[in-house]
A protein has these predicted regions:
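A hydrophobic alpha-helix adjacent to the NAD(P)-binding/active-site core of NAD(P)-dependent oxidoreductases
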Residues: 128, 136, 144
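A short, exposed helix-loop element centered on a Lys and neighboring polar residues
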Residues: 156-157
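Conserved glycine-rich Rossmann-like NAD(P)H-binding loop of the short-chain dehydrogenase/reductase
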Residues: 55-79
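The beta1-alpha1 cofactor-binding region of Rossmann-like NAD(H)/NADP(H)-dependent oxidoreductases
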Residues: 74, 78, 95-106, 138
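Canonical Rossmann dinucleotide-binding motif of NAD(H)/NADP(H)-dependent dehydrogenases/reductases
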Residues: 29-58
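Substrate-binding pocket helix/loop in short-chain dehydrogenase/reductase
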Residues: 84, 132-133, 140-142
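A glycine-rich helix->loop->beta "capping" turn
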Residues: 87-90, 110-123, 129-132, 168
């Protein structure tokens, strides 16, 4: 929509009250959503919007640096959970690594243990290797594949099994 513009459409402020009527009327009450890489950026925006629409949210973020290196910090996921709770919605933090099968299973298990089910999965976790293709080493390339590709698989597989049991599920892959 040219009148609203790209930035206004995608970056409009999230209301500070959960359950506020969405412009399009889409409600997600009683749905449970997992968002990977939700400690900042688009993942944070997805988590906040899902909560605003009534979903219970698992906020997954390893807490590492943008390039995937560095020691993990629980604070990004915890900060988003605090924002969601301040809205009056429900959320729980998860700090597991999407790039391992155990991490993927633990993320989904967090949703099941906390909220009893999984209905929505947004695979958003990613790392940034700020290098041109010719300057990227095989190790850099593998790190990107481990998080972006394998991470999506490791979380989707157990989430899809849970969704099949529920008879409902939606999966979004971001790139």
């Amino acid at each position: 929509d040219p009148e609203r513009g790209f930035v206004n459409y995608f970056w409009k402020a999230v209301p500070v009250t959960a359950g506020a009527d969405a412009e399009d009327g889409l409600r997600l009450d009683d749905r449970v959503a997992i968002v990977t890489g939700a400690g900042a950026g688009l993942g944070r925006a997805y988590a906040l919007e899902l909560a605003r629409r009534g979903a219970k949210v698992v906020v997954n973020d390893l807490g590492g640096t943008r390039d995937g290196s560095g020691k993990g910090s629980k604070s990004p996921a915890d900060q988003v959970v605090a924002e969601i709770k301040k809205m009056g919605a429900e959320a729980v933090a998860n700090y597991d690594n999407v790039a391992t099968d155990t991490g993927g299973e633990n993320i989904v298990q967090t949703a099941i243990d906390t909220f009893g089910r999984v209905d929505i999965l947004i695979n958003n976790a990613g790392i940034l290797r700020d290098k041109s293709f010719l300057k990227m080493t095989p190790q850099d390339w593998q790190a990107v594949l481990d998080v972006h590709l394998n991470g999506a698989y490791f979380v989707t597989r157990p989430a899809m099994a849970a969704m099949k049991e529920n008879g409902y599920g939606r999966i979004v892959m971001t790139t």
